[in-house]
Amino acid sequence: MLLANPIAPDNLLSGSGALVVLAIVLFAECGLLIGFFLPGDTLLFAAGISIATGTITSPLAAYLVVAPIAAVAGNLVGYWIGYTAGPVVFHRPNSRLFRPEYVTRAHEFFERFGSWTIIIGRFVPIVRTVVTVMAGVGRMRFALYTLYSVVGAVLWADGVLLLGHQLGKIQFVRDHKNWIDYLVIVVVILGFVPVAVHYWQGRRR
């Protein structure tokens, strides 16, 4: 009897494990300062395609519920970090993962869009991590912050999932399911490359 290939797409992307991994990545990217370069967009898009092609066997509804919840949970943790320790974090010297230019970029968003930054920034990597902490530092009203976080999480997480799901319904994609599955895995792996590169550059300094 042949052993199953652990790196085959059907094994990597099927079952509840994929949903757990996605939830962890979204939580970290949306709330923890170490989550700057985690490929949340890529994973959401890949999950949508994989659900449509049948590689992921969990129902789409489960992802549409869990993904926004994970993102909002991350936001609330990020707000708490900013509220309790933000000034200390933002005034630290350059570290391998956190740099002043990230704060500057997020601050520019706040200057331009105000509270709407919580929603708009959700679609911008790095910004979606920093603005949550900055909202806590700025003592943004918690109820308003939570409302914007929920709206932004649903629009972003479910929007990208559904976009990938619709693409996965295209006949060409379904006819080349095996190749698409491998392509999805390659794209997801490439999404983690910036993390490794950034960490390596930090170690060289």
Please annotate each region the language model reported.
Residues 158-170:
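Transmembrane alpha-helical segments of integral membrane proteins
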Residues 28, 32, 57-68, 154-155, ...:
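Hydrophobic alpha-helical transmembrane segments of multi-pass inner membrane proteins, especially
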Residues 43, 73, 151-159:
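Membrane-embedded alpha-helical segments of transport systems
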